[in-house]
Amino acid sequence: VCGSDNFMATTKFDAHFTGTAAHAGAKPEDGHNALLAAAQATLALHAIAPHSEGASRVNVGVMQAGSGRNVVPASALLKVETRGASDVINQYVFDRAQQAIQGAATMYGVGVETRLMGAATASSPSPQWVAWLQSQAAQVAGVNQAIERVEAPAGSEDATLMMARVQQHQ
């Protein structure tokens, strides 16, 4: 395969929720539950409307919270990624994700801080590069077929940042 058209743009981030611990039996009203805020945010993230211009994804891959069974949780962590078929679509999902997270924090009276952990751009291969790879593959003994490109989902890849820089200098 000489080219793939479906590297999605992606943004990876953590959301740290900070509430107030309280004894869950004696004084639950003194607590501000970071776990519930993170759970509400998770549900809201997975309810983000799709974009009309292409595919999008959001995933909460990790949720950690609490310190004990009789304590209103004072902290919670979500590890989240957004994806989009284009940089614009990914930005749409990311922006909506930030709104959902802030809304959940406000709803439960807790603080939240998000921290960017990584990103990659959407990418398609250069037609000239694909043609060159195909011509080179045809010269290799044992290669029976060099497929021009695949349109199956390719996920997201850090290498797309390098690909974009190379394409800028062609």
Give the predicted meaning of each segment.
Residues 1-125, 153-154:
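Midchain, well-structured core segments that form catalytic/ion-binding scaffolds
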Residues 115-170:
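An extended, acidic, His-containing surface patch that forms the Zn2+-binding/catalytic region
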